[in-house]
Amino acid sequence: MKMFHKIYFGDSVVKLTEEMVKSLENEIVFIATASKDGVPNVAAMRAIKVLDAEKGIVLIADNFMNKTLKNILENPKVALTTANCKDMPYQYKGTAEYYKEGEYLKIAEEVDKALKPDLKPKGAVVIKITEIYNLKSGPDAGKLIAKDE
């Protein structure tokens, strides 16, 4: 797997558990972005693959992104959470890069083919997760679970 062009994939404190991987790959995932001016956007995503759980690397196929893509290109900071917050109550924060060709686009094509064979991605968003937060209600709500230095 090639390295990000701008983001370092080196040693990572943020590791995704098997349960987190299953949740991200099988649930609807919401991605939050913001424009360079701070205007927020949230969009539901389904075509997702965890590329490396040990390094917190996640790929999302770009099938219908408009505001989300514009925001990522202006401001690569993103946050993710799954629709199933009851069982997998986590928020993932990280940095995204966009690819319109190459290895990541090929992976996005495979992800789409498994979901819906007639989908053809425009590109791939690859996210390096740098922080994970607990979203479970109670005294630990909002608590930082893991963070890369």
Curated annotation (Swiss-Prot):
InterPro entries: Pyridox_Oxase_N, Split_barrel_FMN-bd. SUPFAM superfamilies: FMN-binding split barrel. PANTHER family: 5'-PHOSPHATE OXIDASE PUTATIVE DOMAIN-CONTAINING PROTEIN-RELATED. This is Uncharacterized protein MJ0282. It comes from Methanocaldococcus jannaschii (strain ATCC 43067 / DSM 2661 / JAL-1 / JCM 10045 / NBRC 100440) (Methanococcus jannaschii).
